[in-house]
UniProtKB/Swiss-Prot annotation:
Matches recorded under InterPro entries: Class_I_gatase-like, CTP_synthase, CTP_synthase_N, GATASE, GATase1_CTP_Synthase, P-loop_NTPase
Organism listed in the record: Methanococcus aeolicus (strain ATCC BAA-1280 / DSM 17508 / OCM 812 / Nankai-3)
Domain Glutamine amidotransferase type-1 residues, every copy: 298-541
Binding-site residues for ATP, renumbered to this chain: 13-18, 70, 237-239
Entries under CDD domains matching the protein: CTPS_N, GATase1_CTP_Synthase
Subunit (UniProt): Homotetramer.
Protein name: CTP synthase
Lineage: Archaea, Methanobacteriati, Methanobacteriota, Methanomada group, Methanococci
UniProt: UTP binding residues: 12, 185-190, 221
Primary enzyme class: ligase
Annotated positions binding L-glutamine: 53, 359, 387-390, 410, 467
The gene coding this protein: pyrG
Sequence segments annotated as region (Amidoligase domain): 1-264
Pathway field: Pyrimidine metabolism; CTP biosynthesis via de novo pathway; CTP from UDP: step 2/2
Length: 542
């Protein structure tokens, strides 16, 4: 097996994850089996208990792993399914080592960072890629962070453990452009590489993030001072879309460098990127344009909704349509003035569809319920996800079924009509971490329903992350008043999908699941595809 390690320097949020994903895409396009790993040097076991403001989106895997959002990019770019094991945290490493110590596995030896922590890191990395040709590992954070040192030491040791021809180091760094001087500065990258070399890691490839093209002189300077080949200084200029990055890196020759350094055997030196290029072309050269309003409580940090926004991009690309996003704070829709706010957005052509994503807690919940009501009453295409489905049910119960005060017990334990309540198995759970209904579950779709037509299947398999459900005691009154429960768990007890009749509303559907985690650039998720198509049809009819 071959290993590629991606590190970052100078500043965070440089795009290490997109770089790793793009390399994975290029190598898969040449026929290699790819495995991806993200290392996060924080002390949590996983990302499940972290605030979206701290961490961004929690990406859920099929097996129920609550992971870093970069795993979402890996899955989307490389079109693979990952597991909880593909996200390694400091907490997970120490938990494993300390558990072994308590069991006596170390036979009385002094347990230390080296070799015990570093050995554990190496074993965890190796265990994820047993059925692949290449494992790509992204080290979170920036070179120089104290939290990253054990991981950097572990990947340094890999070269000795598995051989020089089986390990490659890629360093992603920033080349700041000073406008007043009119030049790119290489010194921060030089210092970053010096720091990395001080740990014992010599990068094989430099990926240089830049606003403007890199001159030959700059490449030569970086090659000299960072001790890499000139053709291994890769320009990573700002792209029009993240999906353009693999194409840019391919033009820079990064895949050929990797193949040569790792001595990879390939019968396909030219990658199959035809469909990918066509998809990128549709994104950057759209024929149409729509705006979807996302009503959320974490809109100050867009990373909290990464998979949702990317799913809209995928669906838009299929329909040659640019999907603009109007970010709407749910707290601004709490009172009756919400109608004026929404009317103004419609008037300004900024509301061709409404999407309410998942979330937790009471803050802003009334605004989400009002947004669902507005979509229902004004025939605006609507997609509700997780909490977005629960809000649609609360609105329907209050305003159609006339169950005044209907609510979720998450927000009002004494609600007169608890139309949303704990899942039975969740009621007595006190721990927060890893205890929700997590991972992939099957739903049976109602024949002839909108959900069934969108999926074009009798069953749907989606990922979940929730503690609450539509209270089964209220299924009958909801359906008697016109709500369609169009998908349920195999035993028929848990409502997985709800919708309105397409004769009364063009597109109103919601799911307890998180469909955004399964959308792919060349295979948009059916629910997002339906939302974009309905919103586009509505706009073109005006």
């Amino acid at each position: 097996m071959k290993f590629i390690f991606i590190t970052g320097g100078v500043v965070s949020s440089l795009g290490k994850g997109i770089t790793a994903s793009s390399i994975g895409r290029l190598l898969k396009a040449r026929g290699f089996k790819i495995n991806m790993v993200k290392i996060d040097p924080y002390l949590q076991i996983d990302a499940g208990t972290m605030s979206p403001y701290e961490h961004g989106e929690v990406f859920v895997t099929d097996d129920g792993g609550e992971t870093d959002l970069d795993l979402g990019n890996y899955e989307r770019f490389v079109d693979i399914k990952l597991s909880a094991n593909n996200n390694i945290t400091t907490g997970k490493v120490y938990w494993s080592v300390l558990s072994k110590e308590r069991r006596g596995d170390y036979l009385g030896k002094t347990v230390q960072v080296i070799p015990h922590i570093t050995n554990e890191i190496k074993e965890l990395i190796k265990s994820t890629g047993t059925n692949c040709d290449i494992t790509i590992v992204e080290i979170g954070g920036t070179v120089g962070d104290i939290e990253s040192l054990p991981f950097l030491e572990a990947i340094r040791q890999f070269k000795k453990d598995v051989g020089d021809n089986n390990v490659l180091y890629v360093h992603v760094s920033l080349l700041p452009y000073i406008k007043t001087a009119g030049e790119i500065k290489t010194k921060p990258t030089q210092h970053s590489v010096k720091e990395l070399r001080g740990i014992g890691i010599q990068p094989n490839i430099l990926v240089c993030r830049t606003e403007i093209p890199i001159s030959e002189k700059t490449r030569e300077k970086l090659a000299l001072f960072c001790d890499v080949e000139k053709d291994a200084v890769i320009e990573a200029k700002d792209a029009r879309t993240i999906y353009e990055v693999p194409l840019n890196l391919e033009r820079e020759g990064i895949a050929k460098l990797i193949i040569n350094k790792l001595k990879l055997n390939t019968n396909n030196s030219k990658p199959d990127l035809k469909e990918w290029r066509a998809m990128v072309d549709r994104i950057v050269n759209p024929l149409n344009e729509i705006t979807i309003g996302i009503v959320g409580k974490y809109i100050m940090l867009k990373d909290a909704y990464t998979s949702i926004t990317e799913s809209l991009v995928h669906a838009g690309a299929k329909h040659d349509t640019k999907v603009n996003i109007e970010w709407i704070s749910s707290e601004e829709l709490r009172d009756e003035t919400y109608k004026e706010t929404m009317d103004k957005l419609v008037e300004d052509e900024k509301l061709d569809g409404i999407l309410i994503p998942g979330g937790f807690g009471e803050r802003g919940i009334d605004g989400k319920v009002n947004a669902s009501k507005y979509a229902r009453e004004n025939n605006i295409p609507y997609l509700g996800i997780c909490l977005g489905m629960q809000c649609a049910v609360i609105d329907f119960a209050r305003n159609v079924c006339n169950l005044k005060g209907a609510n979720s017990t998450e927000f009002d334990e004494g609600a007169p009509f608890p139309v949303i309540d704990y899942l039975p198995e969740q009621r007595d759970i006190e721990d927060k971490g890893g205890t929700m209904r997590l991972g992939e579950y099957k739903a049976i779709l109602k024949e002839g329903s909108l959900a069934q037509k969108l999926y074009n299947e009798k069953e749907a398999f989606e990922r979940h992350r929730h503690r609450y459900e539509v209270n089964p005691e209220y299924h009958d009154i909801l359906t008697e008043n016109g709500l369609i429960i169009s998908g349920t768990s195999p035993d028929g007890k848990l409502a997985e999908f709800i919708e309105l009749d397409t004769l009364t509303h063009p597109y109103f559907i919601a799911t307890q699941a998180h469909p955004e985690f399964k959308s792919r650039p060349n295979k948009p998720h059916p629910l997002f595809d339906g939302l974009v198509k309905s919103a586009l049809d509505k706009k073109l009819k005006k």
